[in-house]
Structures are given as structure tokens and as C-alpha cells.
């Protein structure tokens, strides 16, 4: 199986109005147990890098102006890698990078290939979702150059390899549901935050994506009641609002 590890650095979190400024891609063969090809590219865009994004990523506008690839070239590279793969993998890729890629492709007048999406934030068996650097550290793995797109892409693959890629891919195929928290509202909402629930301002709820098979275990582990949201409320709408 060929898997494409993928990560973006962007000008912000808005998939409609922000842009990819760095692309990290790495092809991995499960049969050979090694990376086959990798690329990291800065990407030019019509949205300027802010000081805040520079503080987070280390990427400066001057570097993009001098060394960045045009968007058309960068997205061609993305397609080249994804087209060789059966699946894409990344950390929080299901909520962020892949939807960002879909919006980017649509804006460029193309459609992304259909592949499986494996998310090391959600799909690692028996491990609580956390930041990539934290999950790697708990596995005894070093993430050098965090917030470098290529380092993060390869880091997600290394994390999956540590936990068993076959097990991670299998878990990625278990349906994911949206669970709502019914914790009493407090000034700091600590219970919700500690249990990894996220606030959705459009629906005005605290929610979390959970594997269908993990709902009962989550209900036992938190000090408040939860419920599975009706399927009319899509995960995509929750993630994108």
C-alpha cells in the first residue's frame, strides 16, 4: 500500500479565504517499510503572511516571495503525489488539511482524487487525541521542526507506523459520529476543554468527533452526560463553522 503523508501550513484557519503557504508531501510504502519520495515547497498566494503566522510557522513573506512556487505548480505536485496513493494521512487532516485541499482544488478549477483519509488525531487506537508533538513524545518519537509542513507530514506517518499502520488504517474506516456535551456551562468551560470538546458558535454546542465504537467508553470517562448528534448535523458542517 502506498500512503501519501500530507501537511499544510496556511495563512490562517479559514478554508475559504486563507491560503496554503507551505506544502509537505511524502510517499510511504507499507510493503517496503520506507519513504519513497518527499517534497516540501513554499507556495505563493494572494494572501500575505501576518506576523502571527510567522511566529507560529517561522515562515516569512520575504521567503515566499523569493523561493515560493506558483499555486498552479504546487497543486500539480499535490496531485502527482496523491494520484500514486491509496490513502492520505496527516494529523487533523480530516478536519483541516484535506478540506483545505478540496477548497484549494475547487478554486483552481480541478477536483481532488478520491482516496482514503487517515487521521492520526482521531485514528490511533487507544490514544487520546492531542497535538502531534505530544502524541509523538508519548510514543518516544522526536518531532524536529514542528510546524514545518514536511516534518509534520512525515511525523504523522511515523506516529502511525509506531502504533501499527494496518491498525490505524483499519480504525480510520470505523464511522465517526458527532457527540454533544451536556456539561453545565461555566466561565472557563474546563470540563469540556479537558475532555477535548470544541465549541461550535453556529450551533452553540460543545461537541467532539468520536469513533462510533468509542461512544460508550467516552460516556464512562467524562463527568457529564453526552449524546450522539442527529445525522442531519453533519461532521463537515461542524468542522467548517
Q: What spans do the regions from the language model cover?
A:
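Conserved non-catalytic scaffold segment of RNase H-like nuclease domains
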Residues: 1-114, 129-144
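Conserved beta-strand -> loop -> alpha-helix junction used to position metal-binding or nucleic-acid-contacting
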Residues: 110-124
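Short, structured loop/turn "capping" segments at alpha-beta junctions
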Residues: 112-113, 143-146, 166-172
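Acidic, divalent-metal-coordinating active-site segment for phosphoryl/phosphodiester hydrolysis
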Residues: 148-161
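Acidic two-metal-ion nuclease catalytic site recognized across multiple nuclease folds
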Residues: 159-241
